[in-house]
């Protein structure tokens, strides 16, 4: 019996020690460093309106359906963050072809003056997560004519807005040149007021 206690005692102490270290100390240290070094990112990169209410995050896309605003990528989960993911069909899957054709038809209805051959692929295909907040600058630019027509904002103003909201690759290496749709639409909304 004494031998069992002598074996169990160090096991219990080690388990408790690692439980405290890995479950409490390490997360607190990492959270403290994140809050000190990159507070905005650690808090979810939230965007607030004039009333200091959270209206979104720069990291999660939103579904913009009003034709006066820029639209983001197609989302098979309708931008519901709790259901992140996508039907990642193989290029040979007929369902992918149907989904893309449906996206192109919707595009043509809203943007009849833009030839389908000029529509960037990111506007008619899903992302892996279904939550992409960004589109390519070209994807934003092909929407300028529609938005200009509906809002009476000059195309040049919209082009400059896109240019101002365009972000380069992170550290000059990671990712693509992109435009955050939520931030772009918030700036557009300021012009429309």
Swiss-Prot record:
It is found in: Cell membrane. It comes from the Bacteria. The chain crosses the membrane at residues 14-34. GO terms for molecular function: ATP binding; P-type potassium transmembrane transporter activity. It is a single-pass membrane protein. Belongs to the KdpC family. The system is composed of three essential subunits: KdpA, KdpB and KdpC. GO terms for cellular component: plasma membrane. It comes from Bacillus cereus (strain AH820). Part of the high-affinity ATP-driven potassium transport (or Kdp) system, which catalyzes the hydrolysis of ATP coupled with the electrogenic transport of potassium into the cytoplasm. This subunit acts as a catalytic chaperone that increases the ATP-binding affinity of the ATP-hydrolyzing subunit KdpB by the formation of a transient KdpB/KdpC/ATP ternary complex. Pfam families: KdpC (PF02669). Keywords: ATP-binding, Cell membrane, Ion transport, Membrane, Nucleotide-binding, Potassium, Potassium transport, Transmembrane, Transmembrane helix, Transport. This is Potassium-transporting ATPase KdpC subunit.
